[in-house]
Amino acid sequence: MKPLLVIFNPRSIPEFYKAIEKINGISKLWIKYFPQDEAYNKARLFFLQSDYTHFMILPDDLIVTQADVDAIVNYDESYDSISGLCNNTGRDDTNIDTNISAFLPPDPPRTATYEGYRWFKIAQFESLLSKVENSDAIIPVLHQGFALSRLSRRLIEQVRFRTDAGCCVDSCLSLDLMKFRVGFTQYVDIRIRMKHLKIPRSELLVGKEKAIMLFEN
């Protein structure tokens, strides 16, 4: 397996930079300050023109550890889409909901409401973890809001990223819709929990800083 960690970086978040400095043993592609549609398409094209086998998505408002990255990398290659989970920042209290839903996003995604997703609660997964064996901690889901994710090359080849203007997390919502339609199942390991930061949209530097791609081998 040869994974590429793709870091979507439209902001400048010190806590994220401090965390990512500690991540080693994996190639990194930084997509900095591009509009969302350009960012995902440029990353996809770079990946498809390379010999990397897996596309790993990391947004810059998610704090991950080396253990998180290693765990996601080391899953069996039979998983076309697998991720951890994180807290959801859609409420003032960011420690109630997860980023996981058992329901598909609406189409188009911009018509979604927060309540409409019926997010799993953090407490639900904590309770489940206390009762299941490790082998039962990996569950199929219809939507997860971009915790650290690993996507196979065949998935990236078949599923294009698309955006739906007006939706704050449109690329992940649209990607979930397309994965489902093409026939891919996505899985979440509920043992791997990451910290999702609540960052105001005013912190976006798209259009304010020069858009660049940086590769670190």
Residue ranges and their predicted role:
Residues 41-54:
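Active-site nucleotide-sugar/metal-binding loop of Leloir-type enzymes
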Residues 65-162:
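Conserved catalytic core of nucleotide-sugar-dependent glycosyltransferases
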